[in-house]
Amino acid sequence: MILSEALNLLPDTKGCVVILSGGLDSTITMRLAVEKYGAENVSALTFFYGQKQAFEIECAKLSTSMLGVCHKVVDASFLGDISQGFSANVDKNIEMPTIRDVLGDPRPPTYVPNRNMILMSIAAAYAETKNVDTILCGLQSTDEYNYHDTTARWIGKVNDLLSENRIIKIKLIAPFSSLSKYEEIKILQELDGNTDLLANTITCYNPGKNGYSCGKCPSCAERINAFLKLKLKDPAPYNIKITW
């Protein structure tokens, strides 16, 4: 996909709210939004919900600072509280799975119950206060370990609800939903000529105390494979040795 095609994935509107996790997908989504609308017309929301990979919040702060984007961090830690004993994403006593563990699982152990619906609702409230009608997110329906709340159908159902707003018809858009991480990184390369922005991202579900990615979890596996396919070195650090 060329850059002009990627920009056409975003609607022609005055600005947007980006749900920014601090990972690869949402960071490239934000970079594309800045190219389309200008940094002054982009606002980013990051959520803390008790996730093990809370280092990503600091990554989000760094990337928004680099791009000059308004950034808010929302405390949604109640999600982590109610998901104890259920989700490996928030419970320190539940071991993180490898990608082999989750392939074909209709509900991976990293799933946080109704997380995406809750976070999208908060983002919609924020978008309304900003008087913008577009929320961008980095959801991917093509993830090898699929969640029901990342699919095009799910996004369509959310938009059906959002369309009930009588004043601002807010719409949730996942511009990269049908793309691979490989294709996303290529878009960033065309935007910047490099992947330096991704040095301040973390995709890992189980980072070390130093903030480095584990290199073994499902998210790390996908990210590493994308860089290997492009014959590039990931600028983000890992706790295992990788031959790029």
Task: Report the location of each language-model feature.
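ATP-dependent adenylation/nucleotidyltransferase module used to activate substrates
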Residues: M1-N194
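A structure-centric signal for secondary-structure junctions around beta-strands
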Residues: T13-K14, L198, C214-C217
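Local cysteine-cluster metal-coordination motifs and their immediate loop/turn environment
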Residues: S121, T203-N225
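Glycine-rich nucleotide phosphate-binding loop and flanking beta-alpha elements
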Residues: D143, F227-L228
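Glycine-rich phosphate/adenylate-binding loop
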Residues: D192-P207
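Short microdomains enriched in Cys/His and/or Lys/Arg
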Residues: K229-W244
